[in-house]
């Protein structure tokens, strides 16, 4: 499972870092 330069937040969305 690859993550795209971001962090998973409890809401199930990804925020760019």
Swiss-Prot record:
GO terms for molecular function: rRNA binding; tRNA binding. Transmembrane segments: none annotated. The keyword Acetylation does not apply. GO terms for cellular component: ribonucleoprotein complex; ribosome. The keyword Acetylation does not apply. Keywords: Ribonucleoprotein, Ribosomal protein, RNA-binding, rRNA-binding, tRNA-binding. It comes from the Bacteria. Located at the top of the head of the 30S subunit, it contacts several helices of the 16S rRNA. In the 70S ribosome it contacts the 23S rRNA (bridge B1a) and protein L5 of the 50S subunit (bridge B1b), connecting the 2 subunits; these bridges are implicated in subunit movement. Contacts the tRNAs in the A and P-sites. Belongs to the universal ribosomal protein uS13 family. Part of the 30S ribosomal subunit. Forms a loose heterodimer with protein S19. Forms two bridges to the 50S subunit in the 70S ribosome. This is Small ribosomal subunit protein uS13. It comes from Paracoccus denitrificans.
């Amino acid at each position: 499972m690859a993550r795209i330069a971001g962090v998973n937040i409890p809401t199930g969305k990804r925020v760019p870092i």
